Amino acid sequence: MLEPINVSLESLNLITLAPMLIAIAGGLIILILDLLNEKLHKSLYVMLTVLVLFINFGSVLGLNVNERGFFDVMLIDGISIISQLMIIGGSMIFIPLALTSKRFHEYSYPEFFALFLFMIAGFQFMVASDNLILIFVGLETASLSLYTLIALHNRSNSYEAAVKYFTMGALAAAFFAMGSAVIYALTGSVELYKVAEVMATRLNETGLMIAIFGSSVLLLVSFAFKLSLFPFHTWAPDVYEGASAPLAGYMSVVPKIAAFVVSIRLFGMYIDLGIEWVRWTILIIAVLTMTLANIMALVQNDVKRMLAYSSISHAGFIMAALALDTTEGNTSIFLYYALFMFTNLGAFAMLWISRHKKRRFDDRYDHPYEKFAGLIQIMPMGAVVMGLFMFSLA
C-alpha cells in the first residue's frame, strides 16, 4: 500500500512565489475587466499594469535572502532578488510609453498588457529557481508571450519577426530540454545543487565525462540562441527590425537578464567542478561575439539594426565576465547591465520619438542614417540626448 505523502507548510513557503503570483493575477484581472466591459479606456490598463509592477517590486524587496520554497524548487538568493528588481525596473521604464500621444496601436489592446505581465512572471520563475524543469516552464511562458507581443505590432515584417523568433526559440528550447534530460539521466536530479554534488563524486568516470560534454554543448547552444551569441545571432537583427522600437529596446535588455542569470547558475556549476573547457569555450564565443558583431554593426544601413548588433556585442562582454565565475565577475555583470539597460532603452526610445508614419528616406528601412541628418536643427535636445546614449554604448 502506498504511504501517504506528508506536506508541511514550511516546505511550501508560498511567500517565495508571491512576486510571480502578483504578476499572473494582474494579467488575469486585465483580461477579466476587458471581458466585463470592452469600452473601458485603454489608459486604465496601462495604469493597472504599472500598479501591478510597483506591487511586484515591493514584494521582491520583502523577500528573505538565502531561502527556499515550494518544495525547494524556488531559490531566493542575492542574484535572484537583484535580477528580479532589474527585470521589473526595466519593465516599469517601458510600460509608461503607452500613455504618450505617439503610442503604437498595440498599446490599445488589453491583451498586450496581460501578456506582458505573464512574460514578467516567466522571467521571474527563470531567475528564482535552480530547478531545470521550472526554469524551462518560465522560459517558455516568457517566450510565448513575447512572440505574441511582437506580432501585435500588426505589420508584415512584424509577423515575419515573430515567426523567426518563434522558430529560433523553439530550437533553443529543444536544445535546453535535451541537455536537461542528459543531466537528469546522469544524476537522477534536476536541482542544480544536487546535480553538482553527484557530478563531483563521479568526475573520474570516462563515460560520465562524455555525457557531461554532450549536456554542456546542448545547453551552450541553447543559451547562445537566447542571448544571440555568435554564431547563433542571425535572427536578432531581423526580429528587432520587425518589432516596434520600444519593444525592440526592451527585448535587447530584459529577456537577456533572465537568460544570463540561468547561465551563471548552469555554467558556473560546470566551471566550479573544474571542467575548464567550458570556461574556454565561453571565452572564445565571447571574443567572437564582441568582434564580429561590432564589425557587422559598421556596415548596417539602418540605425535599429545597428543597435541590434550593438546589443549582441554587449552580450559578448558579459559572457567574458561570466566565464570568470567569481563574485566580483557576477557583480560586474549586474552593474554593467543596469547601466546598459538605461542607455539601450533610451537609444531605442529616441528611435521611437523620431519615427514617421511613412518611410520618407528609404523604402526598405524605418530608421536609415539619412533620417537623423540635421537632427540638431529639428530637435536640438533630442539630438543631444541621442548623442549621449550613443557615446554611452560605444
Which residues does each PLM region occupy?
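Alpha-helical transmembrane segments of multi-pass membrane proteins predominantly involved
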Residues: 1-394
